[in-house]
């Protein structure tokens, strides 16, 4: 195991640029519900086609807006965790060397201080 860690450290030290791929697992540690967990996931309570489609928005815009407002409110109660903070600190110490590519829409990487974040699915903090 130590050899593996030493090799990883060496790769990171010599890399010109590092891309970190992030998903639901990192934010689950902060208490953000995932979409896929069978018992507690967001889709355990709602069907995607009822809230997360253009057709749903056209039929029941108030329901969709309310659902997103509820999600935004729940995110206001959570904080970035050690994983988010470690990535932000790495970026601070090594400017221009780290990009976080995330599927998450919670904005916790940005709240932790990460600047170079590509949010593949957008952000609940921004309406488009």
PLM ranges: what are they?
Residues 1-128:
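Conserved catalytic core of sirtuin-type NAD+-dependent deacylases
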């Amino acid at each position: 195991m130590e050899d593996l860690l030493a090799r990883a450290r060496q790769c990171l030290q010599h890399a010109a640029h590092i891309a970190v791929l992030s998903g639901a697992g990192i934010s689950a540690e902060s208490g953000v519900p995932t979409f896929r967990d069978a018992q507690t996931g967001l889709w355990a309570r709602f069907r995607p086609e009822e809230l997360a489609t253009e057709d749903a928005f056209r039929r029941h815009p108030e329901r969709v807006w309310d659902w997103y407002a509820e999600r935004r409110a729940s995110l206001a109660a959570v904080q970035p965790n050690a994983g988010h903070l470690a990535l932000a600190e790495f970026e601070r110490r090594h400017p221009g060397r780290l990009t976080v590519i995330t599927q998450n829409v919670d904005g916790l990487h940005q709240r932790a201080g990460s600047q170079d974040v590509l949010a593949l699915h957008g952000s609940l903090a921004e309406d488009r």
